[in-house]
Amino acid sequence: MNHAIEAAYEKQMEEVVFNGDETRWFVIEQIDGKTGHRWYLWVFRSVSVIFYLMAPTRGADVPKIHFAGIKSLEIVVVCDRYTAYKSLASANEEITLAFCWAYMRRDFLDTARSYPEFEEWTFGWIEMIR
């Protein structure tokens, strides 16, 4: 790691609220040890630092390695419900997951559709999410 990246990483690991996400990323170039062109772009954002990581996998090791340097006793990672983040939190008691509001909103909408008797209640919560 170069000095600027290392300093940014150290700064990020001192913070307490993060956003995490990942998406497929197609790499055209052949890379030793990787079959196929599907890689993953991971993003870990805190208040002052945004890290973009390219990884050949979408596995739980990527966030576990990234957050290995956390310094705070309690942090929150806002993310989707992907199992890699659940695995991260299971392995680190200082990490609390806060699932993305968009996913929570979908759950409320599904409840309203499936249980009309709870429609008023669910739409009340949806209004608070906005």
What are the functions of these language-model segments?
Residues 1-130:
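Catalytic center-proximal scaffold of phosphoryl-transfer enzymes
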